[in-house]
């Protein structure tokens, strides 16, 4: 049994909304919004030519420019792509990252 929940979304990015890329996908692909980057949440990382460069052991909070109204009692989870972690050492620090009714990304 599945339940459908309507979640209002404001997309201020230039990216399409997240969606399942294949029929067997367990989650949707979320894309970074790199148009208005700030250095406020970069630690051992910097912006160069519109790209975020993360130094070894560095951290960065990357915006999506998506804003959602998540119903109370529900959450979204952000998980790393296994290929990014394996090939480049990029992961989500607090895996899974929880976005609940009090937060939006």
Model-derived features: positions:
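DUTPase catalytic domain/fold
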Residues: 1-105
């Amino acid at each position: 049994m599945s339940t459908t929940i309507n979640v209002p979304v404001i997309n201020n990015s230039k990216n399409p909304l997240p969606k399942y890329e294949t029929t067997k996908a367990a989650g949707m692909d979320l894309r970074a919004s790199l148009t208005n980057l700030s250095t406020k949440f970069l630690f051992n990382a910097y912006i160069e030519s519109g790209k975020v460069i993360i130094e070894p052991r560095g951290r960065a909070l990357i915006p999506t420019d998506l804003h959602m109204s998540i119903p109370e009692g529900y959450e979204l989870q952000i998980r790393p792509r296994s290929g990014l972690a394996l090939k480049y050492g990029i992961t989500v620090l607090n895996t899974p990252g929880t976005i609940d009714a009090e937060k939006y990304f």
